[in-house]
């Protein structure tokens, strides 16, 4: 099945990740729907389900969004397996909500004709994403694709 928008985010009880990434992604997905931009059936979430990351699945089940969950090895950030999964399921727009995306990873998605948006990404991948949004990190160097500050 093909989706129009694919969110790639996690949630967990982990030192480096809490629930902010998936909370923001759910907020965006709900706004796409409430503003009649998308239907729920057009949205897919990809998330990890290993120990420490099971909160993502719980949030998505509660909100009744379609999702696929994978092991940490399969969706390890910036891995070729993660890229393959996204390219197989992902729609026209891929939304990545995480901190350290690599350029090579973004390239592997964009070469398949997909648009990529990143949120609060400190990795060099944000430099080549179609849109980078940084509401939290205001000290990131400005670029033409970056929107930063609390307005975003």
What are these regions (language model features)?
Residues 109-118:
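Short beta-strand/loop segments at the ligand-binding rim of alpha/beta enzyme cores
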Residues 86-100:
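Short N-terminal targeting/anchoring amphipathic segment
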Residues 34-83:
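Conserved nucleotide-sugar phosphate-binding/catalytic loop shared by glycosyltransferases and other
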Residues 19-36:
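Histidine-anchored nucleotide/phosphate-binding helix
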Residues 2-18:
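Nucleotide-activated donor-dependent transferases that construct or modify glycoconjugates
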Residues 70, 119-121, 135:
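Generic beta-sheet signal
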Residues 128-152:
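A nucleotide-sugar donor-handling region in carbohydrate enzymes
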Residues 4, 92-93, 131:
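Structural motif
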């Amino acid at each position: 099945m093909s989706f129009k928008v694919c969110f790639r985010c996690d949630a967990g009880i982990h030192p480096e990740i809490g629930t902010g990434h998936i909370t923001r992604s759910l907020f965006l997905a709900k706004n796409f729907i409430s503003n009649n931009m998308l239907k729920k059936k057009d949205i897919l979430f990809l998330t990890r389900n290993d120990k420490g990351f099971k909160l993502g699945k719980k949030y998505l089940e509660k909100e009744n969004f379609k999702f696929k969950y994978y092991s940490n090895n399969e969706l390890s950030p910036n891995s070729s397996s993660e890229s393959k999964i996204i390219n197989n399921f992902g729609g026209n727009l891929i939304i990545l909500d995480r901190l350290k995306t690599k350029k090579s990873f973004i390239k592997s998605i964009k070469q398949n004709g997909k648009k990529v948006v990143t949120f609060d990404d400190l990795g060099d991948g944000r430099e080549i994403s179609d849109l980078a949004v940084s509401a939290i990190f205001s000290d990131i160097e400005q670029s033409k694709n970056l929107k930063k500050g609390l307005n975003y």
